[in-house]
């Protein structure tokens, strides 16, 4: 089971303490990983710069690391956010853009020897061929790209 805590609000409507209580509840219910993000990744979301995203996630990461033994994943496509999160002991980066939005993301993840969840995503919703074949090709390319980043 995966727990997703996303801080979508312009201001902190979800406090660190509320996030911790929610995470504890989800772990008690069987969550294996806490996945949190400082920017919504749903279609049409408002862009949040890396500094604001860090302002939102860093206090929560620190509190969760103090209170829980559950692995933490950070949902981000920004290398700066990934780097700072991994420095605090986050175990995995969940990149919904599959390492395509920030050219430094793969090297940051490799530097920390961290886990990564690479999702398929694209700006265009039109596919030249079968959707499953397109996704397979995308993920194969990203696997090869990641492998090269980790083996430099």
Model-predicted segments: where are they?
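Conserved anion-binding
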Residues: 4-10, 40-44, 97-152
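Glycine-rich, proline-tolerant flexible connector loops at the mouths of alpha/beta enzymes
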Residues: 7, 32-59
């Amino acid at each position: 089971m995966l727990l997703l805590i996303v801080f979508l609000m312009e201001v902190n409507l979800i406090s660190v303490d509320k996030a911790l209580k929610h995470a504890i509840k989800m772990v008690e219910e069987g969550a294996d990983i806490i996945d949190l993000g400082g920017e919504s990744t749903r279609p049409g979301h408002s862009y949040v710069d890396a500094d604001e995203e860090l302002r939102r996630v860093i206090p929560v990461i620190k509190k969760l690391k103090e209170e829980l033994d559950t692995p933490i994943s950070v949902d981000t496509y920004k290398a700066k956010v990934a780097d700072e999160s991994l420095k605090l002991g986050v175990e995995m980066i969940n990149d919904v853009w599959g390492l395509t939005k920030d050219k430094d993301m793969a090297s940051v993840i490799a530097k920390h020897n961290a886990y990564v969840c690479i999702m398929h995503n694209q700006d265009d919703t039109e596919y030249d061929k079968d959707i499953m074949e397109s996704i397979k090709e995308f993920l194969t390319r990203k696997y090869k790209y990641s492998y090269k980043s980790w083996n430099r």
